[in-house]
Amino acid sequence: MKFRTILCLRTETHYFYGMNVLLLGSGGREHAMAWKLSESSMLRDLHIAPGNGGMHELGTMADLDAMDFQAVERYVRRHKIDLIVVGSEAPLVAGISDYFEASQKTSVTVVGPKKQGAMLEGSKEFAKNFMQRHNIPTARYASFGSDQLAEAVQSLDAFQAPYVIKADGLAGGKGVMST
């Protein structure tokens, strides 16, 4: 495991920290994270990618695709980023934490689970199977592919209404239908 020392200077009663942070995301959750990060006395510079129109006052906006890990890595090296905070799920599910842990070019710390842990959010089926395997209480379910519509409809007899249908994978909070 690689660690990086964060600069901390002490003068009489004050500490001055120098941490450069890259926040990945563009939604409301990331906006709230940027707001709180920008208030930290430990922050030197906050970089936000891709951000949204309301976040430009909180930090430096970066025209960066969070799914292009090599581009993120180049940005991290160029701007001497100490910490990456991943707000959106897609880069986590794609393995950004694993990528930077394996990187020989940078020793940046990533806040966010590794790819396998992110699958709990990234795949409803993975999460349900995990819960069953570890005896974690969860609602009954059945999983079907898009080519199994007849089987899915037929299985409704085994469940009691109301039914909740969820898309497997990331859906930006819009992958649920309830009847």
Predicted features along the sequence, with ranges:
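Short, glycine-/small-residue-rich phosphate/pyrophosphate-handling segment
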Residues: 123-144, 152
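ATP-binding N-terminal substructure of ATP-dependent carboxylate-amine bond-forming enzymes
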Residues: 15-113
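Short, positively charged and aromatic/hydrophobic N-terminal segments
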Residues: 5-6, 15
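Glycine-rich phosphate-binding loop of ATP-grasp-fold ATP-dependent ligases
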Residues: 139-143, 163-179
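Short acidic-hydrophobic, aromatic-tinged amphipathic segments that line or gate anion-handling sites
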Residues: 61-67, 142-147, 179
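Glycine/small-residue-rich loop that forms an oxyanion/phosphate-binding "nest" at active or ligand-binding sites
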Residues: 101-114, 121, 127-134
